[in-house]
């Protein structure tokens, strides 16, 4: 029960403290076929763990198909409860949103693709993925940026964790036109949520054997908002004398990540900064296709890719890299205390990459998504006995 209890321990501790044109192609027959194929192959296992699946937009349905194929081959005792929610495929409504929320609340665990948000203003400022985070209070986004053996990038042997507060900050959806041609966007920072994410970061570092936490901010300019966030991090840091604590301004952090990312261990930051740093750091180890991510509340766990990109231009072309989603699915199994299957799948993915014979285009190869899935399945083997 160690893996499952780790996350639950963290959450208990926490309680203590856009171009729309490309998206019209999503309504093509290829996209519909991928979604249909994915839905038709639901895993049905007696006594299995129920998990909500939300394929999302872009290549999401294709990535979920990869997860299902690998889970089937590995005989993973998980039953997917699939729902489709999209703001670009006429598959969004308050009723569908409530159905998704109901499923996630019932199952407690979900695996999701990116729900693309059109840049046009259509009356609702809060996107569906933002509403899901808020309604489920998925306050902590965790992205583990780690180099993959056998896949050389500009920086190798990286191992750092980005923890992002994702229920307030700049993504408050509080915008209005105060005068013609003048838009005001409100950034919300609260002591309660700043302390909560800081405590989550230090608890995470403690449980995972990490030695340092760096708070990323812009308090030199936003003296009250980011100043409060920084103050909360400093106060929480005093409760963890064995964990080294540092602070860094966001612009300097971006430069330092490119020049010397090895100085970082665990980074904690507000919403917008985390969104930017997640993507920057993913680029250091190979891009959006190889970095897994997860989001937590006190009750729920959601698994996804670390860099949230729908990759619309790849829809139906069989070129998407399923590495990040498969690794995220492996993390989900560890959360469910299915260590045997989690290790089997993660090791198979890493072996495929280390051997280097099967790589998708984003990794410099010519293999298709299907090729990668078949290779992973071919590398599955019994674990722990």
From Swiss-Prot:
<dbReference type="GO" id="GO:0006099">
    <property type="term" value="P:tricarboxylic acid cycle"/>
</dbReference>
<dbReference type="InterPro" id="IPR024084">
    <property type="entry name" value="IsoPropMal-DH-like_dom"/>
</dbReference>
<keyword id="KW-0007">Acetylation</keyword>
<dbReference type="InterPro" id="IPR004434">
    <property type="entry name" value="Isocitrate_DH_NAD"/>
</dbReference>
<dbReference type="GO" id="GO:0008047">
    <property type="term" value="F:enzyme activator activity"/>
</dbReference>
<keyword id="KW-0816">Tricarboxylic acid cycle</keyword>
<keyword id="KW-0496">Mitochondrion</keyword>
<dbReference type="Pfam" id="PF00180">
    <property type="entry name" value="Iso_dh"/>
</dbReference>
<dbReference type="GO" id="GO:0016616">
    <property type="term" value="F:oxidoreductase activity, acting on the CH-OH group of donors, NAD or NADP as acceptor"/>
</dbReference>
<dbReference type="GO" id="GO:0051287">
    <property type="term" value="F:NAD binding"/>
</dbReference>
<keyword id="KW-0809">Transit peptide</keyword>
<feature type="transit peptide" description="Mitochondrion">
    <location>
        <begin position="1"/>
        <end position="34"/>
    </location>
</feature>
<dbReference type="GO" id="GO:0000287">
    <property type="term" value="F:magnesium ion binding"/>
</dbReference>
<feature type="modified residue" description="N6-acetyllysine">
    <location>
        <position position="199"/>
    </location>
</feature>
<protein>
    <recommendedName>
        <fullName>Isocitrate dehydrogenase [NAD] subunit beta, mitochondrial</fullName>
    </recommendedName>
</protein>
<dbReference type="GO" id="GO:0005739">
    <property type="term" value="C:mitochondrion"/>
</dbReference>
<comment type="similarity">
    <text>Belongs to the isocitrate and isopropylmalate dehydrogenases family.</text>
</comment>
<dbReference type="GO" id="GO:0006102">
    <property type="term" value="P:isocitrate metabolic process"/>
</dbReference>
<comment type="subunit">
    <text>Heterooligomer of subunits alpha (IDH3A), beta (IDH3B), and gamma (IDH3G) in the apparent ratio of 2:1:1. The heterodimer containing one IDH3A and one IDH3B subunit and the heterodimer containing one IDH3A and one IDH3G subunit assemble into a heterotetramer (which contains two subunits of IDH3A, one of IDH3B and one of IDH3G) and further into the heterooctamer.</text>
</comment>
<comment type="function">
    <text>Plays a structural role to facilitate the assembly and ensure the full activity of the enzyme catalyzing the decarboxylation of isocitrate (ICT) into alpha-ketoglutarate. The heterodimer composed of the alpha (IDH3A) and beta (IDH3B) subunits and the heterodimer composed of the alpha (IDH3A) and gamma (IDH3G) subunits, have considerable basal activity but the full activity of the heterotetramer (containing two subunits of IDH3A, one of IDH3B and one of IDH3G) requires the assembly and cooperative function of both heterodimers.</text>
</comment>
<dbReference type="GO" id="GO:0045242">
    <property type="term" value="C:isocitrate dehydrogenase complex (NAD+)"/>
</dbReference>
<dbReference type="InterPro" id="IPR019818">
    <property type="entry name" value="IsoCit/isopropylmalate_DH_CS"/>
</dbReference>
